[in-house]
Amino acid sequence: MAGRSSNRSIGTVAMRWHGDRLELLDQRLLPAEEHWIVADGASAVAQCITDMVVRGAPAIGISAAYGVALAARHAGGGDWQAEIKQAIRVLAKSRPTAVNLFWALERMEKVFHACHSLDEATDRLAAEAVRLHEDDLAANLAMADYALEVMNPDKPIAVLTHCNTGALATGGYGTALGVIRRLHEEKLLKRVYADETRPWLQGSRLTAWELTRDHIPVTLNADGAAAAIMASGKVKWIVVGADRITANGDVANKIGTYNLAVLARHHKIGFMVVAPSSTVDMSLESGKDIPIEEREGTEVREIRGIPLAPAGVQVFNPVFDVTPASLIDAIVTEKGAVRNPNITGMRALFT
């Protein structure tokens, strides 16, 4: 593996656990305002996930795990098992595409079913949520190592990224943005080009904010400028995250990712997906099986109440698109990298 730098920051945290409550950094307000929302129960956590107070597949899963822990913490003395089961159901409905959500809830549910009293459930579920959070950070650090092995740069390079895959979207450090952090730590990063990522502007509001805070050189660009940047020869790799990866290596990620993969293939630029193995859903054969969330048209027609389009105009607003495995050069997880992904390579990750 690539050598690990001792000069490392895990980045700005997206959540703070206090045992009886979860604090979530309201990412809808960044970069203008840093405001923390207190979630003191599972329903409050679920609402924060739905409303995109917290976003990013790993962070959603971790938040949901803490939500289950809070359900146990605040359960009544009656049918506490029914209360926790209901909390899990509510959390499962908060975002349909991020498989990490269901993976985290299944992990918490296994612990829950092994508990024989409310006190035991309270202690064990809280400990499991913290462990899940710590495991995610460790996975991000491992993914950065594997990604650098795939890239194998012999001099500083520039990369382009999409959406936000940093500490704000994970348990710390980041997935795709964690790779960028590692390049910077090893003095192998020339510059990051960050797509603004319409319509929620995660690139401009979050990625540019994270990188600027951590003194990592970043240039913000309109989504439509990505092709021109690639054509200029400025970037060597496109590095993105994932919300769900299927058994054949197809990837669901933030809308606009598919565009980048097509452009990267045309310009002969490497296209890398970085995500924890919990994002891989081997029960789905291909990207055609992934449910794609669509959100309200107001997210495209306006920004914070300011009209950008005629009132009532029809809007197509899918949150994700699916990039075929045939356009991906490598999928990197904490278990290793799959180059030119296919079903054989994806299965090998789990053997």
UniProtKB/Swiss-Prot annotation:
EC numbers, comma separated: 5.3.1.23
Top-rank taxon: Bacteria
List of residues binding substrate: 55-57, 95, 202, 253-254
Keyword Amino-acid biosynthesis: yes
Record-linked Pfam families: IF-2B (PF01008)
Pathway: Amino-acid biosynthesis; L-methionine biosynthesis via salvage pathway; L-methionine from S-methyl-5-thio-alpha-D-ribose 1-phosphate: step 1/6
UniProt cross-references to HAMAP family, sorted A to Z: Salvage_MtnA
Functional description taken from the UniProt entry: Catalyzes the interconversion of methylthioribose-1-phosphate (MTR-1-P) into methylthioribulose-1-phosphate (MTRu-1-P).
Record-given protein name: Methylthioribose-1-phosphate isomerase
The organism of origin for this protein: Marinobacter nauticus (strain ATCC 700491 / DSM 11845 / VT8) (Marinobacter aquaeolei)
Gene expressing this chain: mtnA
